[in-house]
From Swiss-Prot:
This is B3 domain-containing protein At1g20600. It is found in: Nucleus. It comes from Arabidopsis thaliana. SMART domains: B3 (SM01019). SUPFAM superfamilies: DNA-binding pseudobarrel domain. GO terms for molecular function: DNA binding.
Length: 237
């Protein structure tokens, strides 16, 4: 092999030139691979950005739904019997059971034959359970003060002090009896059923808005507990 001057070149110089060219080619290939890897990393970052934005958007929507749900929860007012519910939250079977339960009532006049007692028990105390009634940290069923004053307190014995607590028998949906206490908390301001209520909730799996309790007439037994010392729970779920 000859150079530009026409003189032959040594094999050593030729080998060095070939080695240099190969080294340059290898470096160029390595540089190109690094560029491709960098582009892939950028693509991954770009691709993950929409996912991150979607995730953040979902989190914001979830927080908005939680805030909306909290706003829609019923406020605690004096009449604990009041609760706003959405009829679409219930299945057709549950709605049918609720309707049947409300309609299946005996005529109190046929039972008592007394106008005054009939007036007091024309409708028993009924309550749709609220979240505070089934929360594990509450351990009580809140009752309507107005209804308790009209339909329960007048029928207590003189020896029965609701402030200290009155023993009551509570009937479950299956007819089983559990002993609890009816009390007036905060002096005589807040009527509650306690001392065993949460166990009752757990035993029958009672849920807010889906289950009801009643004191007074138990239509299935064709009987009325006129002293307010017995309570029955009707599970509609």
């Amino acid at each position: 092999m000859a150079n530009s001057t026409g003189k032959p070149t040594s094999s050593t110089q030729e080998d060095e030139e070939v080695t240099y060219i190969l080294a340059q080619l290898m470096q160029d290939v390595m540089d190109r691979e690094e560029d491709i890897d960098d582009e892939d990393d950028i693509d991954d970052e770009v691709a993950s950005l929409p996912l991150l934005l979607v995730s953040q958007a979902n989190q914001k929507q979830s927080r908005k739904r939680e805030e909306k749900t909290e706003k829609n929860q019923p406020k605690r007012v004096k009449n604990q019997n009041i609760m706003k519910i959405n009829i679409h939250d219930f299945s057709e079977e549950t709605l049918r059971l609720i309707e049947d339960w409300y309609n299946a009532e005996l005529d109190p006049q046929d039972i008592f034959g007394d106008d005054e007692v009939t007036r007091r028990f024309s409708r028993p105390i009924k309550k749709q359970l609220m979240s505070s009634d089934v929360d594990t940290d509450q351990s009580r069923l809140m009752l309507s003060k107005e209804q308790v004053k009209e339909k329960m307190l007048p029928f207590l014995e003189e020896s029965e002090d609701p402030v200290k607590g009155v023993d009551v028998s509570v009937y479950g949906p299956d007819g089983e009896v559990q002993q609890m206490k009816f009390k007036m908390w905060n002096g005589d301001k807040t009527p509650v059923l306690t001392s065993g209520w949460m166990q009752f909730v757990a035993d029958y799996g009672l849920l807010k808005t889906s289950d009801f309790v009643t004191d007074g007439k138990v239509s299935q037994l064709e009987h009325v507990f006129i002293r307010g010392s017995k309570v029955r729970c009707c599970n509609t779920s």
